[in-house]
């Protein structure tokens, strides 16, 4: 298959089934179950000390410095390198063939966490450590409930910190565009692992529930997917690349 024919109507339908409909069919029922069961509280309870009424790791220096700050800086550094490479592609002939991929990566790495941040800023759901059951003063509000009257912290859903890891899903789609299976798999599993690791650290600190992190992952996936579809539209086709190590897509 030539690059220009890489997304015919048939393969486009297959692509959307694989990257949109199947992920939604798996993620939405799982997220619904988390919403109507006690799993979130059980997981957060592992890190909550009922005797002191707090999350012992909330202000832990190692967690704050390494997993809360440094981890995000690594992702910001990656985004900075990508944007720098995209700018250099206007001057270095060797980078011109991947200019569109670099543009996609820079945009996806910025917009995926950005969308999560906007959603979080508008949310009425509070962090676990602000909830009454964990020593705070805010009520637990389900996804399907309206905000109750009163001045509560809110702005804690979905997880912004986890999105710094999940945005690395962009490298999965870059691997598809370049037909580099190793890059696609590294982006898929690396992004998932980073998002879950960043998210787990914040669960341990009482800052998020498990469902907050998984919602963040789904939002990042959908944002990155949308950007990929817009930039690598069917009529243009993905950039030319050797057929070896072609990623499925």
Stretch-by-stretch model annotation:
Residues 6-8, 37, 83-94, 172-179, ...:
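Structural signal for the C-terminal ends of transmembrane alpha-helices
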Residues 87, 91-95, 122-127, 131, ...:
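Membrane-interfacial segments
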Residues 2-82, 120-128, 138:
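N-terminal transmembrane-helix/juxtamembrane module of multi-pass inner/ER membrane proteins
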Residues 42, 97-181:
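Membrane-interface loops
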Residues 17-18, 141-249:
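Membrane-embedded catalytic cores of phosphoryl/pyrophosphoryl-handling enzymes
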Residues 10-20, 88-102, 177-188:
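Membrane-interface helix-loop-helix junctions at transmembrane boundaries of multi-pass membrane enzymes
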Residues 29-33, 110-115, 192-203:
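Aromatic-anchored segments of alpha-helical transmembrane domains
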């Amino acid at each position: 298959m030539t690059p220009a024919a890489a997304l015919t109507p048939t393969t486009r339908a297959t692509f959307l089934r694989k990257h949109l409909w199947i992920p939604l069919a798996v993620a939405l029922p799982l997220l619904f179950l988390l919403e109507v069961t006690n799993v979130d509280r059980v997981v957060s309870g592992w890190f909550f000390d009922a005797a002191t009424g707090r999350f012992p790791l909330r202000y832990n220096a190692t967690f704050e410095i390494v997993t809360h700050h440094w981890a995000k800086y690594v992702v910001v550094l990656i985004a900075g390198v990508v944007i720098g490479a995209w700018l250099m592609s206007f001057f270095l002939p060797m980078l011109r063939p991947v200019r569109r991929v670099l543009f996609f990566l820079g945009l996806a790495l910025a917009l995926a966490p950005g969308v999560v941040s906007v959603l979080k800023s508008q949310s009425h759901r509070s962090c676990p450590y602000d909830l009454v059951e964990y020593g705070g003063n805010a009520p637990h509000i389900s996804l399907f409930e309206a905000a109750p009257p009163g001045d509560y912290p809110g702005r804690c859903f979905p997880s912004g910190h986890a999105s710094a890891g999940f945005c690395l899903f962009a490298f999965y789609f870059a691997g598809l565009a370049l037909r580099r299976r190793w890059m696609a798999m590294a982006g898929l599993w690396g992004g998932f692992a980073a998002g879950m690791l960043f998210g787990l650290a914040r669960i341990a600190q009482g800052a998020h529930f498990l469902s907050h992190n998984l919602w963040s992952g789904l939002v990042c996936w959908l944002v990155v997917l949308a950007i990929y579809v817009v930039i690598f539209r069917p009529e243009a086709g993905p950039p030319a690349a050797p057929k070896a190590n072609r990623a499925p897509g």
